[in-house]
């Protein structure tokens, strides 16, 4: 029997897993995905740190993406799993605010970081001679700190505003985490002003970055087409297609949830789509970036050989 343990300020997360065998199967599946995401992203961070061949702006940005994904999925899955395991789906008002803040911080930072990674590839392929200047250490450190800071500021503003809205007696959030669009359905007041604010923020963090990424890769594909080296074209296509796959997995469901009017989508759709950008993407990113990347696989081989040579 589920024990909500609710107080007047608690929210109830209805969750993703039904109380049945299917729910148990999904619980086990998502815990395995969570563990894969932890192992994959931690391995990517350690690999880039340990292998000097990967000490480049491209891989430094990739290590930050892994760090964001690691925190991203850790903000959502442990609470969701414990809710199902112990049957206590309540979350305090403050706890909900903290989860919402970190979720939006990591989401915003990842959107901006993916744009920085696209710019990095654009400069590397279209202006290779200018790459050391345009992507200096100062530049990529600014990109990373800027992504984190802007994501945090945006998240702080939304969290403070969302948690000052009066909520009705029904505190049941039809979601598996404290997502603002799902919470707005419980508000006792008209939230159209805030919804427009969310739309504007989503445009800044989704539409503008995606447009920048699309333009960058448009120029990249044109430059690749003009390359004389077949090996160079193959490497460039591989790198770009990998990044575009990650971008599509992340941006498409996010854009539908936050830019599509509430009347044209259901809360069930929001929950299913949220699985893509909160759980599946953090698990898939290290796999996508490593399987098709000879430099990463080569670095992995070198690190393993060094470990065994030290032991011997």
From Swiss-Prot:
It is a multi-pass membrane protein. One of its GO terms (cellular component) is plasma membrane. The chain crosses the membrane at residues 25-48, 57-78, 100-119, 139-157, 195-218, 236-258, 272-291. CDD domains: 7tmA_OR2T-like (cd15421). It is found in: Cell membrane. Keywords: Cell membrane, Disulfide bond, G-protein coupled receptor, Glycoprotein, Membrane, Olfaction, Receptor, Sensory transduction, Transducer, Transmembrane, Transmembrane helix. Gene3D superfamilies: Rhodopsin 7-helix transmembrane proteins. It comes from the Eukaryota. Disulfide bonds join 96-188. One of its GO terms (biological process) is detection of chemical stimulus involved in sensory perception of smell. InterPro entries: GPCR_Rhodpsn (IPR000276), GPCR_Rhodpsn_7TM (IPR017452), Olfact_rcpt (IPR000725). Residues 1-24, 79-99, 158-194, 259-271 are extracellular. Its main location: membrane. One of its GO terms (molecular function) is olfactory receptor activity. Glycans are attached at residue 5. Odorant receptor. Belongs to the G-protein coupled receptor 1 family. This is Olfactory receptor 2L5. It comes from Homo sapiens.
């Amino acid at each position: 029997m589920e024990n909500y343990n609710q107080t007047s300020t608690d929210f109830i997360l209805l969750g993703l897993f039904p109380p049945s065998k299917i729910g148990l199967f999904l619980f086990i599946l998502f815990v395995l995905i969570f563990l894969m995401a932890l192992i994959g992203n931690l391995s990517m961070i350690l690999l880039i740190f340990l292998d000097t061949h990967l000490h480049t702006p491209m891989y430094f940005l990739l290590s930050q993406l892994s760090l964001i994904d690691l925190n991203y999925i850790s903000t959502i899955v442990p609470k969701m799993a414990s809710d199902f395991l112990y049957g206590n789906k309540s979350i305090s008002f403050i706890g909900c605010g903290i989860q919402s803040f970190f979720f939006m911080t990591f989401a915003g930072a990842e959107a901006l970081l993916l744009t920085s990674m696209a710019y990095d590839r654009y400069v590397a392929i279209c202006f290779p001679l200018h790459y050391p200047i345009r992507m200096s250490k100062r530049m990529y450190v600014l990109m990373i700190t800027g992504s984190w800071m802007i994501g945090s500021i945006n998240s702080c503003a939304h969290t403070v505003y969302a948690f000052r809205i009066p909520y009705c007696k029904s505190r049941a959030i039809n979601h598996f985490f404290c997502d603002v669009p799902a919470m707005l359905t419980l508000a006792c007041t008209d939230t159209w002003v805030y919804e427009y604010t969310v739309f504007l923020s989503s445009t800044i963090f989704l539409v503008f970055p995606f447009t920048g990424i699309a333009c960058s890769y448009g120029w990249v594909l044109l430059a690749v087409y003009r390359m004389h080296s077949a090996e160079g074209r193959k490497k460039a296509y591989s790198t770009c297609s990998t990044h575009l796959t990650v971008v599509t997995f992340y941006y498409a469901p996010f854009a539908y949830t936050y830019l599509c009017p509430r009347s044209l989508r259901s809360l069930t759709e929001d929950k299913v789509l949220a699985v893509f950008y909160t759980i599946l993407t953090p698990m898939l990113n290290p796999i996508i970036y490593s399987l098709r990347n000879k430099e990463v696989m080569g670095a992995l081989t070198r690190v393993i050989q060094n470990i065994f040579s030290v032991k011997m």
